[in-house]
UniProtKB/Swiss-Prot annotation:
Its cofactor is Mg(2+). The keyword Magnesium applies. It comes from the Bacteria. InterPro entries: dUTPase, dUTPase-like, dUTPase-like_sf, dUTPase_trimeric. It comes from Burkholderia lata (strain ATCC 17760 / DSM 23089 / LMG 22485 / NCIMB 9086 / R18194 / 383). One of its GO terms (molecular function) is dUTP diphosphatase activity. This is Deoxyuridine 5'-triphosphate nucleotidohydrolase. The keyword Magnesium applies. Coiled coil: none annotated. Substrate binds at residues 67-69, 80, 84-86, 94. Its EC number is 3.6.1.23. One of its GO terms (biological process) is dUMP biosynthetic process.
Length: 148
């Protein structure tokens, strides 16, 4: 798949999104910052990437996901948990960054902060019904299938 990428900050030419390994599903996104930013515990900020994408095809979307090491080691996750980039969005990719840890965290310019994953999308059309065909589960919700 070819993906249109617009470089909004010339410094990002040296830090284009890349797959870390041949098996990677996510492209690393970096913080496009002029200076380090300190996030206090509980603080959230929007971090620019200096990049924009345009998927164009409504059969695809992009997800911005946290990097596992930052969340596990430092408590740095996404403020919106998952960022959804629709196929027709053309603005700068921004990363909502939340320090849920107990200590301050310093985010340095061009540090890898999140990952971008391209996923297929199916746009559903509703079929209005009075009742559903019966299933084994029915309307059983939270915990209805047992604990073990």
């Amino acid at each position: 798949m070819k993906l249109d990428l617009k470089i909004l900050d010339a410094r990002m030419r040296d830090y284009l999104p890349a797959y870390a390994t041949t098996g990677s599903a996510g492209l690393d996104l970096r913080a496009c910052l002029d200076a380090p930013v300190t996030l206090q515990p509980g603080e959230t900020t929007l971090v620019p990437t200096g990049l924009a994408i345009h998927l164009a095809d409504p059969g695809y979307a992009a997800l911005i996901l946290p990097r596992s090491g930052l969340g596990h080691k430092h408590g740095i996750v996404l403020g919106n948990l998952v960022g959804l980039i629709d196929s027709d969005y053309q603005g700068q990719l921004m990363i909502s960054t939340w320090n849920r840890g107990q200590t301050e965290f310093v985010l340095n310019p061009f540090e890898r902060l999140a990952q971008l994953v391209i996923v297929p999308v199916v746009q559903a059309q509703f079929n209005i019904v009075d009742d559903f065909a019966e299933s084994d589960r029915g309307d059983g919700g939270f915990g209805s299938t047992g604990r073990h």
